[in-house]
């Protein structure tokens, strides 16, 4: 019966007895690979205090073979000559396999925690260990995973060796490149010193002249990026104002399109106060969800109208700028007003220099228009 083993029963087992001893155990250079990814233990936690006694991964073996142990892997890193401890990692092995293949179930070994499913056979399994060319499996359990355990993904000894070798090769290549770059820098510094000395003497090398010509050619060939919005194939209500006259896309100012003075209409988004004015306009979501919408048929199209009401701070400078743009097309521009003032002062000076004309010959021409005083006002064009 001893060779056939007995079935595991945790019924009378104390939860604190977990098969751990104070002995250091034996070191094995070539540790067999686990079938599963490891668990990284939270810093400061004790694996044997948190690990459930039936904490056997799912996916390999039959009901009788759900028995084994978790084996600790201590890790550290050298930082400035000092050894810095890293969180422990624990790997699972089935009974009769792994670094403690000869150990019996519940033998007290340092860095070993025994686990088994109720009803598993207490005898070595024949499952073996993972081959070096096979990928480790993800950990899956029937019960809840303790919060101190982090289940790693695709972490195995062969992968670790590969990464270590890769880092070593990368480090060697980096050092080689570093030495090569250092030598190149020395050569470049000598070359630069010679070129600087020649430049002081007024001597320019062919290489310097080629560089100068190349840079000039690059500057001449460089093209200014076109930032003009692509409005040609868009509906009017989907177009975006660019730099320049906006009447091409939105039409002349009228009672139905009454925003913008002559400067804003002529320059579009490049107008001086355009960014400030745009900040006073409602967002798309505000218009969409905060407006009153109506629609009606208009030939083969649908005419959509919305009414949106919102409030701007009365004393804010941006509000004043914004209000000045409403119906501005119907008001004289500041430029025209200034032209009228200058023209009026000029005519007054001319009249004072002329001879006095008898009162009977004076006629009232105050309402006569001068072509320099005429202000062009956009009208609705259909």
From Swiss-Prot:
GO terms for cellular component: host cell endoplasmic reticulum-Golgi intermediate compartment; host cell Golgi apparatus; ribonucleoprotein complex; viral nucleocapsid. The keyword RNA-binding applies. Disulfide bonds: none annotated. Its main location: virion. Residues 164-176 have a biased composition (Basic residues). Residues 33-159 are annotated as: RNA-binding. It holds the Pfam family CoV_nucleocap. GO terms for molecular function: RNA binding. InterPro entries: N_prot_C_CoV (IPR044344), N_prot_N_CoV (IPR044345), NCAP_aCoV (IPR042548), Nucleocap_CoV (IPR001218), Nucleocapsid_C (IPR037179), Nucleocapsid_N (IPR037195). Residues 224-337 form the CoV N CTD domain. The modification Phosphoserine is found at residues 9, 156, 254, 256. Residues 31-153 form the CoV N NTD domain. Residues 231-334 are annotated as: Dimerization. It is found in: Virion; Host endoplasmic reticulum-Golgi intermediate compartment; Host Golgi apparatus. Residues 215-235 have a biased composition (Basic and acidic residues). ADP-ribosylated. The ADP-ribosylation is retained in the virion during infection. Phosphorylated on serine and threonine residues. Residues 154-163 have a biased composition (Low complexity). Belongs to the alphacoronavirus nucleocapsid protein family. This is Nucleoprotein. The gene is N.
């Amino acid at each position: 019966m001893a060779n056939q083993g007995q079935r595991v029963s945790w019924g009378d087992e104390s939860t604190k007895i977990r098969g751990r001893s104070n002995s250091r155990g034996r070191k094995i250079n070539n540790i067999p690979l686990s079938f599963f990814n490891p668990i990284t233990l939270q810093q400061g936690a004790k694996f044997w205090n948190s690990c459930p006694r039936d904490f056997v991964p799912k996916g390999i073996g039959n009901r009788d073979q759900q028995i084994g142990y978790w084996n600790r892997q201590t890790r550290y890193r050298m930082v400035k000559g000092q050894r810095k401890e890293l969180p422990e990692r624990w790997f699972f092995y089935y009974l009769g396999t792994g670094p403690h293949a000869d150990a019996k179930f519940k033998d007290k070994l340092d860095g070993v925690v025994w686990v088994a499913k109720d009803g598993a056979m207490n005898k070595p399994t024949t499952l073996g260990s993972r081959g070096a060319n096979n990928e480790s499996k993800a950990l899956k359990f029937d019960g809840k995973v303790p919060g101190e355990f982090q289940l790693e993904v695709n972490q195995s000894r062969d992968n670790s060796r590969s990464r270590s070798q890769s880092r070593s090769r990368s480090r060697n290549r980096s050092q080689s490149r570093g030495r090569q770059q250092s030598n190149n820098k020395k050569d470049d510094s000598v070359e630069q010193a010679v070129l600087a000395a020649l430049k002081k003497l007024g001597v320019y090398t062919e290489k310097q002249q080629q560089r100068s010509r190349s840079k000039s050619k690059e500057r001449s060939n460089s093209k200014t990026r076109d930032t003009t919005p692509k409005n040609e194939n868009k509906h009017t209500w989907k177009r975006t104002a660019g730099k320049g006259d906006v009447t091409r896309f939105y039409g002349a100012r009228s009672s139905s399109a009454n925003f913008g003075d002559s400067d804003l209409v002529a320059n579009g988004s490049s107008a001086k106060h355009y960014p400030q004015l745009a900040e006073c306009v409602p967002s798309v979501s505000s218009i969409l969800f905060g407006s009153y919408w109506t629609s009606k048929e208009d030939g083969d199209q649908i005419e959509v109208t919305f009414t949106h009401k919102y409030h701007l701070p009365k004393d804010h400078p941006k509000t004043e700028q914004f209000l000045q743009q409403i119906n501005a097309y119907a008001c004289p521009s500041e430029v025209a007003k200034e032209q009228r003032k200058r023209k009026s002062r000029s005519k007054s000076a001319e009249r004072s220099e002329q001879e006095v004309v008898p009162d009977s010959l004076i006629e009232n021409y105050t309402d006569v228009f001068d072509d320099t005083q005429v202000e062009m006002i956009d009208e609705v064009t259909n």
